[in-house]
From Swiss-Prot:
This is TBC1 domain family member 22A. The lineage of its organism: Eukaryota, Metazoa, Chordata, Craniata, Vertebrata. May act as a GTPase-activating protein for Rab family protein(s). The modification N-acetylalanine is found at residue 2. One of its GO terms (molecular function) is GTPase activator activity. The gene is TBC1D22A. Changing residue 167 to E: Complete loss of 14-3-3 protein-binding. InterPro entries: Rab-GAP-TBC_dom (IPR000195), Rab-GAP_TBC_sf (IPR035969). Residues 176-190 have a biased composition (Low complexity). It comes from Homo sapiens.
Length: 517
């Protein structure tokens, strides 16, 4: 009864309104005081001169806490008790009680408590936990207002050790695999992930009937170099999904291509085809990379491929821009037989003639499959490109009106820079290594070269919005858009571009009226 009386007197005293006393107000979304989150703040705050009233409240709170120590066990009253702790203006009492709660909880969970060094301040630091929620509920909830005031740098620094050492204290320094270098760890994890992806591709390609949908899903985020040649041949429709039929199909298609050469190539000097061959002969040395194209064997291969395709497709014939589409296929297929650090410096002098012939045939058929889907880009007046440039203008006006208006104010027309983007599929805008990565995704997308390319171009233009808005002159704007600084781009830049393009496609592809004014 004496204890009950003391408690009643305590509540009576703590609830009595004193003149000039500070009343704490908590909003609907503000949780009870969290000593873990506010320990540093309380410690750094200068203490106010202690008044007799405050000393009395501290003494009373300590008495109450000692009489009700069992209430600090994890239960439904945690929130109420933490709220009472918030009412104390003395940080030492608050932190002492919080430390006791953490020690009790650690003992119940069977985890060792952190030992504080002699030179360290007493500060409770929770142990690193995996992302999954713990079994015990501490009911220490961070409010919306508190999450907004936390420093991003601190959040980032706290997140890194959580991923690096799953169930280890923050103060522990752990060496994994004999090294503690983060770059080594990340590269090791990256190589393991790449090896795992390569195994998935190999298993899929080696099956009796390759699942093309699964192959497209895996290929969207990039194809490992060792399996890229076979994957491209399958995704382009050149080879069948059945493994047993592939050798016969390759042999038949290669023979068919060289039959075309025997039948048509000698007519390149005829008056009817002379202009076509001359234009091809002029355009090939202008292609890039020069180190590859200017090799005599490569020049002859490209001339044959382009001339045969033009003769076999009289509706369009040869149009400037088609020549660029040969390069990615040829480089990918030739890299199956030679090791090259950079695709721009491939040397074919050591490749056997028979292998080069097979690569030439494979390149012709895969390029033909690609052009079958975008042939209206190269027919008379190139209506496919005209339509896509107009669609690009409408799309950009919806997703970034400021960039669109800036181009319009300086009288820059989309045809002046985007025509080449559609005609060459961005091959003149990004390095060849980036084009190959881009085509991994194009071939895994339905109508990737004809439809998805539109959204890639929109994302590509908006990617340079800062630089575009800084240009205040027509000539400078057009010069920038025709010479974009992408020489140092790599796969990561292309992946970001493709991710943004996919977001745009998801928003607009199935609702074309959304980007029509």
């Amino acid at each position: 009864m004496a204890s009950d009386g003391a408690r009643k007197q305590f509540w009576k005293r703590s609830n009595s309104k004193l003149p000039g006393s500070i009343q704490h107000v908590y909003g609907a979304q503000h949780p009870p005081f969290d000593p873990l989150l506010h320990g540093t703040l309380l410690r750094s705050t200068a203490k106010m001169p202690t008044t007799p009233v405050k000393a009395k409240r501290v003494s009373t709170f300590q008495e109450f806490e000692s009489n009700t120590s069992d209430a600090w066990d994890a239960g439904e009253d945690d929130d109420e008790l933490l709220a009472m702790a918030a009412e104390s203006l003395n940080s030492e009492v608050v932190m002492e009680t919080a430390n006791r709660v953490l020690r009790n909880h650690s003992q119940r969970q069977g985890r060792p408590t952190l030992q504080e060094g002699p030179g360290l301040q007493q500060k409770p630091r929770p142990e690193a936990e995996p992302p999954s929620p713990p079994s015990g509920d501490l009911r220490l909830v961070k409010s919306v207002s508190e999450s907004h005031t936390s420093c991003p740098a601190e959040s980032a620094s706290d997140a890194a050790p959580l991923q690096r050492s799953q169930s280890l204290p923050h103060s522990a320094t752990v060496t994994l695999g004999g090294t503690s270098d983060p770059s080594t760890l990340s590269s090791s994890a990256l190589s393991e992930r790449e090896a795992s992806r390569l195994d998935k591709f190999k298993q899929l390609l080696a099956g009796p009937n390759t699942d093309l949908e699964e192959l497209r899903r895996l290929s969207w985020s990039g194809i490992p170099k060792p399996v890229r040649p076979m994957t491209w041949k399958l995704l382009s429709g050149y080879l069948p999904a059945n493994v047993d039929r592939r050798p016969a199909t390759l042999q038949r298609k290669q023979k068919e291509y060289f039959a075309f050469i025997e039948h048509y190539y000698d007519s390149r000097n005829d008056e009817v085809h002379q202009d076509t061959y001359r234009q091809i002969h002029i355009d090939i040395p202008r292609m890039s990379p020069e180190a590859l194209i200017l090799q005599p064997k490569v020049t002859e291969i490209f001339e044959r491929i382009l001339f045969i395709w033009a003769i076999r497709h009289p509706a369009s014939g040869y149009v400037q821009g088609i020549n660029d589409l040969v390069t990615p296929f040829f480089v990918v297929f030739i890299c199956e037989y030679i090791e090259a650090e950079e695709v721009d410096t491939v040397d074919v002098s050591g490749v056997p003639a028979e292998v080069l012939c097979n690569i030439e045939a494979d390149t012709y058929w895969c390029m033909s499959k690609l052009l079958d889907g975008i042939q209206d880009n190269y027919t008379f007046a190139q209506p496919g490109i005209q339509m896509k440039v107009k669609m690009l203008e409408e799309l950009v006006s919806r997703i970034d009106e400021q960039v669109h208006r800036h181009l319009d104010q300086h009288e820059v027309r989309y045809l002046q820079f985007a025509f080449r983007w559609m005609n060459n599929l961005l091959m003149r805008e990004v390095p060849l290594r980036c084009t190959i990565r881009l085509w991994d995704t194009y071939q895994s997308e339905p109508d990737g070269f004809s439809h998805f390319h539109l959204y890639v171009c929109a994302a590509f233009l908006v990617r340079w919005r800062k630089e575009i808005l800084e240009e205040k002159d027509f000539q400078e704007l057009l010069l920038f858009l025709q010479n974009l600084p992408t020489a140092h781009w790599d796969d990561e830049d292309i992946s970001l571009l493709l991710a943004e393009a996919y977001r745009l496609k998801f928003a607009f592809a199935d609702a074309p009226n959304h980007y029509k004014k």
